[in-house]
A protein has these predicted regions:
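Active-site regions of metal-assisted phosphoester/phosphodiester hydrolases
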Residues: 1-151
Length: 151
C-alpha cells in the first residue's frame, strides 16, 4: 500500500496541498497584485510531478508518472520551478534534496524555489554536503540554490 502512487497522491492532497493553498491564499496571493517578482521557497514535503515522469520511471523503481498535487498547484497558478527550468532533463538532473546526509532518496526533490514575474534563472543547483562533514550538516535536506536576474 505504501508503494502505491495513488496513495501518495491522496496523501499529498490531504497534507501538502491544503498547506500550500493556505499559504498561497494568506501570504502569496496578496503579493501578486503588484508587478514585483515573487519567489516562494521551502520544504513542501511533497515530490514534483516534473520529476516523476514516464521517462524517469526507472529512477523511481518503476513508478511514474505521478501527478503530485502540490507541485501542479504551483504551476497552475503561474509559478515556475527554478531548478527544473534550468535543468529540464529530469533523468540527467534528478536534484534530490531529501535525506541528503544519509544517501537515501537522493532522486526525490521536496525542497523548491518557485518564482513568477520579472525574473530570469541564471543558474540553479542542489548543494549537498561534503563527505567529510556529512554528520555535521545542519539539516537532513540538501539546499536548492538559484541565481536570478531581475528583468
Amino acid at each position: 500500500k505504501g508503494l502505491d502512487p495513488s496513495v501518495w497522491v491522496a496523501e499529498d492532497s490531504i497534507l501538502a496541498l491544503p498547506d500550500i493553498r493556505n499559504i498561497y491564499t494568506k501570504d502569496i496571493a496578496p503579493n501578486l497584485e503588484t508587478d514585483m517578482p515573487v519567489i516562494v521557497t521551502g520544504d513542501f514535503n511533497s515530490c514534483s510531478h516534473l520529476d516523476w515522469t514516464e521517462r524517469a520511471k526507472p529512477l523511481h523503481h518503476g513508478y511514474g508518472p505521478v501527478a503530485f498535487p502540490a507541485s501542479r498547484y504551483m504551476l497552475e497558478n503561474g509559478f515556475k520551478d527554478s531548478f527544473r527550468e534550468k535543468n529540464p532533463d529530469e533523468v540527467a538532473y534528478q536534484g534530490g534534496t531529501v535525506a541528503a546526509i544519509y544517501g537515501q532518496m537522493q532522486m526525490s526533490r521536496i525542497d523548491f524555489i518557485y518564482y513568477k514575474g520579472g525574473l530570469k534563472v541564471l543558474s540553479s543547483k542542489i548543494v549537498r554536503t561534503a563527505p567529510e562533514i556529512d554528520y555535521v550538516w545542519a539539516s537532513d535536506h540538501a539546499a536548492v540554490l538559484t541565481v536570478f536576474e531581475v528583468e
